A protein has these predicted regions:
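Core beta-strand elements of the Rossmann-like FAD/NAD(P) dinucleotide-binding domain
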Residues: 6-9, 176-186, 340-341
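N-terminal Rossmann-like FAD-binding beta1-loop-alpha1 element of flavoenzymes
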Residues: 11-36
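Glycine-rich FAD pyrophosphate-binding loop
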Residues: 29-49
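Glycine-rich active-site loop/strand segments that organize a redox cofactor
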Residues: 56-88
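Mobile, glycine/GP-rich and aromatic-enriched active-site lid/loop segments adjacent to catalytic centers
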Residues: 93, 100-157, 224-361, 429-554
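Conserved beta-strand-loop-beta-strand element in the redox core of flavoprotein oxidoreductases
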Residues: 160-181, 187
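Glycine-rich loop(s) and the adjacent beta-strand/alpha-helix scaffold that form part
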Residues: 186-240, 360-380
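Long, amphipathic alpha-helical stalk/connector segments used for oligomerization, subunit docking
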Residues: 384-466
Length: 554
């Protein structure tokens, strides 16, 4: 027997990472009744348990906003949305102080120490480090303290829409054959980044593009997905995040720290042209922000061994299906984190703010951006909801969505979601598809993904609630892959973490712009959103000075 529950509130928050927790807390502070749903466990959701620092901007201790913005604008290759970049910087100290007041302990920072400039030029603060397990506990306790109703281990699968407005969602319990209906005057998607369940990056295992897929299906605009994330992982233990313990073989050959980054053959790795110098006065520090390991694969020279005190062989492609922080997700319809569909908001990695543009511009900015947009979205959604009258959602609208949600478990036969996911991974995984891009290869992959979308996804079947969840995750990942490939084809230039072998140069005349995705008459349509001219770089400055990083083929 299928159990069905209906839960009502003013604001529904989907996702329990730092963005979702901030959204729920701030909505509650506006006296809204808040429901919070997470596929995992609120506080420990998504990538939040893996984040360990937050940037903290404070002019009172010598920070200069123009310096910070100038660095990020150039590092982002001029396609950052400067409104959201500035917002994440200015609100970072407030977020930092708030987390302190909630009991989170940060590691001490010496603002005068040269160590603080390791990841950014002088004048930019070293990010404040903390223990992620402490943050998870503090966030959850604060959400509970605010009176938010938490539902762990529930996957929201489809949004409810009535009279052009999102009015809640339908979800599935992961532990039972239970369908849940959430009625809410405003819904905030905080479901994190996208991924295709890669083996090499555990933070993505539950982040399967659910938010943007649901939003796309109700008509929301989605940000382009061409700027890929380039996290790497260890060869010997792909599922480990970070570089822990040197292998005995490498230690015997090279010692624990040979003092440089090198190939597994022992040849020294020359990073020239594949880095941004961040301490030009010394020339001793640099921050990799591009496709370094993918470009080495392209040249046939992987794996490399990272220069650390615990060297390991590394390969790229760990975060398959993921974009840069804040470089995909729902397109913001305004500065309140609303989407382009009434009643629907987003925050964190689910909101395409482009605060970092085409690269990950500054360590610690991800947490600041997630917390600040969560706070903005929560406040705005609560005010929106409290300004409405009574909300009545028709049974017909609910039942239609429920039938779609349960369709795979009603199928008597079809395709296993695990098998379809493996097909998708095999299609998208090669470095020469997702990272080193060229139109003929992208079109070939897009043809396969379109076939999967049209012929296999409608026939996904599930034998139990666990497999039903997998079916919805697979459907969402396939849709995201189609968006990713079409975005890569659409941007006919190279910039930041988007490298087109057939267009290896930046094209400022045509591509100082963002791409957007929307469903129109059953088709996926991509459009350009021009970047305001006042945010453009000075085009009179020589190309080589505007863009210090060189792509192969330039």
């Amino acid at each position: 027997m299928i159990a069905e529950n209906r839960i009502e509130g003013d604001v529904l928050v989907v996702g329990g990472g730092i963005a979702g927790c901030y959204a729920a807390i701030k909505a509650s502070e506006q006296s809204a009744s808040v429901i919070m749903v997470d596929k995992g466990y609120v506080g420990k959701s998504g990538q939040t348990p893996y984040a360990t620092s937050i940037m903290a901007f404070n002019p009172d201790i010598g920070h200069n906003l123009d310096d910070w913005m100038s660095y990020i604008n150039k590092t982002s290759e001029y396609v950052n949305n400067r409104y959201w970049t500035e917002c994440s910087i200015k609100k970072s100290w407030e977020i930092y102080q708030e987390l302190l007041s909630w009991g989170l302990q940060f590691k001490p920072v010496d603002e005068e120490s040269p160590e603080q400039f390791k990841y950014a030029p002088k004048g930019l603060s070293k990010p404040r480090g903390y223990a992620p397990d402490e943050l998870a506990t503090i966030l959850r306790n604060k959400v509970i303290e605010c009176g938010v109703k938490i539902l762990d281990r529930v996957m929201v699968t489809e949004l409810l829409k009535q009279d052009g407005r999102v009015v809640g969602a339908v979800g599935l319990s992961i532990d039972s054959d239970e369908t849940l209906t959430f009625i809410a005057k405003a819904t905030i998607l905080c479901v994190g980044a996208c991924g295709f369940k890669p083996a090499g990056y555990p933070p993505l295992v539950q982040l399967t593009c659910d938010g943007e897929a649901m939003a796309y299906r109700v008509g929301a605009e989605i940000g382009g997905k061409e700027f890929v994330d380039t996290h790497y992982t260890r060869v010997d233990i792909p599922g480990v995040v970070g570089r822990k313990s040197v292998s005995p073989e490498l230690e015997a050959r090279f010692g624990r720290d040979p003092g440089y980054t090198f190939f597994a053959t022992g040849e020294k790795y020359n990073a020239e042209g594949n880095r941004i110098d961040i301490r030009p006065e010394n020339g001793s520090e640099y921050f990799f922000t591009y496709l370094q390991l993918e470009l080495e694969a392209y040249a046939g020279r992987t794996p490399i061994v990272w220069h650390t005190d615990r060297a390991n062989e590394l390969v790229g492609g760990a975060a398959l299906g993921m974009s840069l922080r804040k470089a995909d997700g729902l397109w913001p319809g305004n500065t309140d984190c609303a989407s382009t569909v009434p009643g629907l908001y987003a925050a964190g990695d689910s909101l395409c703010t482009y605060q970092n543009g085409a690269t990950y511009a500054l360590i610690g900015s991800a947490v600041s951006g997630s917390a600040s947009t969560g706070a903005i979205a929560g406040t705005a959604a609560a005010k929106d909801a409290l300004g409405m009258g009574a909300l009545v959602v028709s049974d017909d609208a609910i039942n239609q969505v429920k039938n779609n949600v349960r369709a795979p478990i009603e199928h008597k036969n079809g395709y296993s979601p695990r098998w379809v996911t493996q097909l998708l991974q095999n299609t998208m995984m090669p470095y020469f598809i997702s990272y080193i891009k060229k139109e003929d290869r992208l079109q070939a992959a897009a043809t396969i993904v379109s076939f999967i979308q049209e012929n296999l996804v409608p026939c996904l079947y599930a034998r139990d609630p666990h497999e039903l969840r997998h079916a919805h995750e697979t459907k969402n990942m396939v849709l995201s892959a189609e968006m990713r490939l079409k975005s890569a084809i659409f941007r006919t230039e190279s910039r930041g973490n988007h490298f087109r072998e057939d267009y290896p140069r930046r094209d400022d005349a045509n591509w100082l712009a963002w791409s957007k995705i929307k469903e129109e008459n059953g088709n996926m349509k991509l459009t350009k959103e021009p970047i305001p001219k006042e945010w453009w770089p000075d085009l009179s400055v020589p190309y080589e000075e505007r863009y210090p990083f060189r792509f192969p083929g330039e």
